[in-house]
Amino acid sequence: MSEVLFPAVRRRVVRPLARLFPSLRMSHARVLERTDHMTTTLEHPPVQHAQADIASGVLDIETGGKGRLRGRNLQPEPADPALSPALIRRHGLRRGDLVEGVCGDRRTLTDVVRVNGRTPDRRSRPHFADLTPLHPHERLRLEHPAAGLAGRVVDLLAPVGKGQRGLIVAPPKTGKTVLLQQFAAAVAGNHPEARLMVVLLDERPEEVTDMRRSVRGEVYSSTFDRSARQHIALAELVIERAKRLVEAGEDVVILLDSLTRLCRAHNNAASSGGRTLSGGVDAGALLGPKRFFGAARKAEEGGSLTILATALVETGSRADDFYFEELKSTGNMELRLSREPASRRVFPAVEPVGSGTRREELLLSGAETTALRGLRRALVARDGQSGLETLLERLRRTPDNATFLRQVQPTLPAG
């Protein structure tokens, strides 16, 4: 019965009172607080909370300090609610916060009710830059039925941990898009506690649709018909949103396709007056991509940000080669894809010898470390194509990696 009566109470009692706020000297937030108490008492879902007067979205702070609440794809829209610089300062809001507030005339927020799902409290919020980064030591398993053999191969050759900063080095037509979809399915299936974000930059619209339909997570896109500055703005807002979640102690996984295109966008948007490096790259073009990729970390205080980003190679562009050479040393995990197996329709087209993870022993048990090092030595002893095909064939015969390692360990070289 309460579910029927409460909207009527709001319509006939609460909203008329709202017109008296100035004379009563009572803020919107105070009335909403009382309204929330009524909602809880009547056991009504919070989603009914002041539907006509509440706006929510991810905060984007523009030049000059004014804020806007971005919607589903984090792209600017004319109807995005605005926040004044004073309101942002009063509540200590940061770019990337999920803000819920009272929306007055002209789509402008007059007060803030919740920040990231909680009551605003600027004093208890840590700053991302103050969190202590650690080597990843908690496993992010990609072995999952929805990931096929790809997840199992990565767990064996280049294990991923929470807070990993990984590059997927991909020549053209080596299956990187399908690989990202499989990774997304594995993360969603094995780690429902993690917030999954897929970021597609300078991509074809049909690829975006395919990704949205196949991924159980948040998919953000800026297609090839948008400007370089729009690509950059989306990437910056996504990474700021991820930082706010990590500050709250959450685990976030970002799959970016691609880091190379983000570098291209920064280079195209850079002023032509700067110093030019190899391949026509502006000297400051890599600062933005490095900030994005460098945000990945495991925080000692809790929370983590994992970024697996594709890097395009063998494209015929000197600039793309330069981007990769500059960025490859910043990661702590690398998965190399190869054209040779891909041309023979052997997938996942992983290059076993060139793939690996720094400090992988922190993610593995002692027995796993010994077994995987023996497996890598056995693969190095073969040529790349033969080693990969043998590995995939043996994996198909076993239900999981644990069984596979038990079966092959007696035959692996010691050392």
Swiss-Prot record:
User: Which BP terms in the Gene Ontology apply to this protein?
Assistant: DNA-templated transcription termination
Q: Which residues form the Rho RNA-BD domain?
A: 52-119
Q: What is its EC number?
A: 3.6.4.-
**Does the record's keyword annotation contain Nucleotide-binding?**
yes
Q: Which PROSITE patterns match?
A: RHO_RNA_BD (PS51856)
The protein's job, in short, is: Facilitates transcription termination by a mechanism that involves Rho binding to the nascent RNA, activation of Rho's RNA-dependent ATPase activity, and release of the mRNA from the DNA template.
Give the NCBIfam families listed for this entry.
PRK09376.1
Q: Cross-referenced PANTHER family, in alphabetical order?
A: TRANSCRIPTION TERMINATION FACTOR RHO
> Assembly and partners?
Homohexamer. The homohexamer assembles into an open ring structure.
Q: Of which family is this protein a member?
A: Belongs to the Rho family.
What name has this protein been given in UniProt?
A: Transcription termination factor Rho
Organism (species): Streptomyces coelicolor (strain ATCC BAA-471 / A3(2) / M145)
